[in-house]
Amino acid sequence: MNSVERLPMPESSTSHSADPRDVESIDAIIAATYDVISGPAGQKRDWNRERSLFYPGARIMPTASVPGRNDVDLEPQLLDVEAYIARVEPLLQQGFYETEIARRTEQFGRIAHVWSTYESRHEASDAAPFMRGINSFQLFNDGKRWWILSIYWQHESADHEIPQKYL
């Protein structure tokens, strides 16, 4: 009989404890994810908060090989949380606000998949977004809190418009 190695359940994804309000529900963890990356030019992001949302070994996977480009040279980038922070931190020197505009959630037991359609702006007051796309979140609840296992996304482009069912 084959045995399966069980990994210990983490207290947090790093030494950074999550705010219980950020991880108490699917709505809360999705909102926290958008909140932590959004802010005005030059505002330092709370990367410890970001780290606390992710399960150890979680992946963040943009499909654009060059950060901030719309659907150019598509190639998944398999990043851990630290590599993601290093990739986006220079881009956040200008204002960046990402907001969810629609969501489809499917849940079975303690696992959930969330299709989260987003818009990105340089200023919260910008009339039109400079980018839109869809984030695919895979979540897990350990009985105490929700964790992000992965986020995978693609920006909208002329070749790949967001389908109506995701708006």
Where are these regions (language model features)?
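Tryptophan-centered short beta-strand motifs
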Residues: 76, 127-129, 146-148
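Non-catalytic cap/lid and distal C-terminal segments of serine-dependent acyl enzymes
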Residues: 20, 55, 83-87, 96, ...
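A short, polar/proline- and glycine-enriched secondary-structure boundary/capping micro-motif
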Residues: 71-74, 125-128, 157-165
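Short, low-complexity N-terminal intrinsically disordered segments enriched in polar/charged residues
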Residues: 1-53, 167
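Short beta-strand segments enriched in hydrophobic/aromatic residues
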Residues: 37, 54, 118-120, 152-155
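Surface-exposed, charged secondary-structure patches
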Residues: 59-60, 64-126
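Short beta-strand edge/turn micro-motifs at domain boundaries
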Residues: 2, 132-162
